[in-house]
From Swiss-Prot:
Cellular component terms (Gene Ontology): mitochondrial matrix; mitochondrion
Transit pept. (range): 1-27
Pathway given in the UniProt record: Lipid metabolism; fatty acid beta-oxidation
Protein name (Swiss-Prot/TrEMBL): Enoyl-CoA hydratase, mitochondrial
Native source organism of the sequence: Mus musculus (Mouse)
InterPro entries registered for this protein in UniProt: ClpP/crotonase-like_dom_sf (IPR029045), Enoyl-CoA_hyd/isom_CS (IPR018376), Enoyl-CoA_hydra/iso (IPR001753), Enoyl-CoA_hydra_C (IPR014748)
Taxonomic lineage of the native organism: Eukaryota, Metazoa, Chordata, Craniata, Vertebrata
Its EC number(s): 4.2.1.17, 5.3.3.8
Post-translational modification N6-succinyllysine, affected residues: K101, K115, K204, K217
Amino acid sequence: MAALRALLPRACSSLLSSVRCPELRRFASGANFQYIITEKKGKNSSVGLIQLNRPKALNALCNGLIEELNQALETFEQDPAVGAIVLTGGDKAFAAGADIKEMQNRTFQDCYSSKFLSHWDHITRVKKPVIAAVNGYALGGGCELAMMCDIIYAGEKAQFGQPEILLGTIPGAGGTQRLTRAVGKSLAMEMVLTGDRISAQDAKQAGLVSKIFPVEKLVEEAIQCAEKIASNSKIVVAMAKESVNAAFEMTLTEGNKLEKRLFYSTFATDDRREGMTAFVEKRKANFKDH
C-alpha cells in the first residue's frame, strides 16, 4: 500500500517528494485527466487502454489518480465498443505504491470515519475483464492494484512486493488477502513480514503472473490478449469472469451452483445460440452481445 522511500533508491525517494503534476491529458469523453492517459486500441477499438502517468513519482497512487482511474474505468465500462481493458504504467514503474505524503499525518479517527482507501477497489467491480501490464516496480498499493485486475502480464524486469511493514504499517487495500490467495500462505507471509520483493520470474512460478514478456513487448501483448477476449460475447465473458472470481469467495459446492446457474443463463442469450450454430456450421461466430 505504500510508496517506499525505504525500499527505493534515494534518488527515487527525493523525486517522490518533489513531484510536479504532468500536463493535462484529454480523454475521448472530453474529461481532463492529470494523472492518467487513456485511449482505445485494437483493430475495432475494442480495447480500452489506461496508462498511469506520474513518472516523476514512479506512479505513486495519490487520491487524484485513483479518482481519475475510476472515472476512466467507468467510461470504458459503459462503452459498448470496448470488450476488455488494459491497465499499465511506465517502463520503470507500474506503480511504486501509495502517496506517502497523503498518508503521513492521518489519524485512526480520520481513516476510520472517512473509510480511507475504500474507493481503491472500484476496479474489482468492473464487469469487463481488466489486464494489468506490469513493468518495473509494483510495490505496496501498486501490487495491490495489479492483483485487483483479472489477469497480470509482467515485463521481464518487473518486481512485486508488499513492503508496508518497513513503514510501520501493513497493506490496507487487499494485499494480505489477495496475495495469500495468489501465491499461498508461506510466500505471502514472508513478503508481508519482511517487505522483500519477488521478480517477475518468481511471481510467475508462484502463480501471481500468467505470462512474462520483454519490456518493450509487454503492452502490445496485453492488448492482443484483451482484443482476443473482446472478440467473444461481452455478456458471456462477464458471466465467465463472475464465475471464476466466485471461486475465491465461495465454497466448492456454492461455486459449482453459481457456475451452473450462469451456464444455464447463457442459454437465454442469442450469442450462445450463434456460437453453437457457428460451430456446427464450421464458421466463425458473429456475436452481437445479447
